[in-house]
Swiss-Prot record:
Family membership: Belongs to the universal ribosomal protein uS7 family.
Any one GO biological process: translation
Organism expressing this protein natively: Pelodictyon phaeoclathratiforme (strain DSM 5477 / BU-1)
Gene3D superfamilies: Ribosomal protein S7 domain
The protein's name in its UniProt record: Small ribosomal subunit protein uS7
Length: 155
């Protein structure tokens, strides 16, 4: 049987010294263009620092991530010919990955401006518990709440 490979250790980003920011840069990256992704994220942080004078952009980012990351989600399980949506707790690593994905998707869907401006706007909205990515988290939580009756079918 093959040996199970562990997780790849991701270093910290060079400006903020934060592993979460480094993971977010990797999530924003397209086609292996890390320099472009890094510029987008750092420009978004600079826009946040400019618009919200006196607030640390890293704190705004952390607050936004805590408001976007889901605690529970529904997973499909087939039981006797019927498929049930079973609410499950989300692991910490998946929680962050979902938050990154939703933030990136809903920032990109905003109209008109550069990606850095759209990302900054979505981060600021998420920090204030608004924005499309927070709505997505609320929708996932609502689905889990609606299917609470099937929680005893856990995997």
């Amino acid at each position: 049987m093959p040996k199970k490979v562990g997780y790849k250790r991701i270093g910290v980003d060079f400006r903020y010294g934060d592993e979460s920011v480094a993971r977010f840069i990797n999530a924003v990256m397209l086609d292996g263009k890390k320099a472009v992704a890094t510029k987008i994220v750092y420009d978004a942080f600079a826009i946040i620092a400019e618009k919200l004078a006196g607030e640390d952009p890293l704190e705004v980012y952390r607050k936004a991530m805590s408001h976007i990351a889901p605690v529970v989600e529904v997973r499909s399980k087939r039981v006797g010919g019927a498929t049930y949506q079973i609410p499950m707790e989300v692991k910490a690593s998946r929680r962050g990955a979902l938050a990154f994905r939703w933030l990136k998707i809903y920032a990109a869907k905003r109209g008109g401006r550069s990606m850095a401006e759209k990302l900054a706007a979505e981060l600021m909205d998420a920090a204030n518990e608004q924005g499309a990515s927070v709505k997505k988290r609320d929708e996932v939580h609502r689905m889990a709440d609606a299917n609470k009756a099937f929680a005893h079918f856990r995997f």
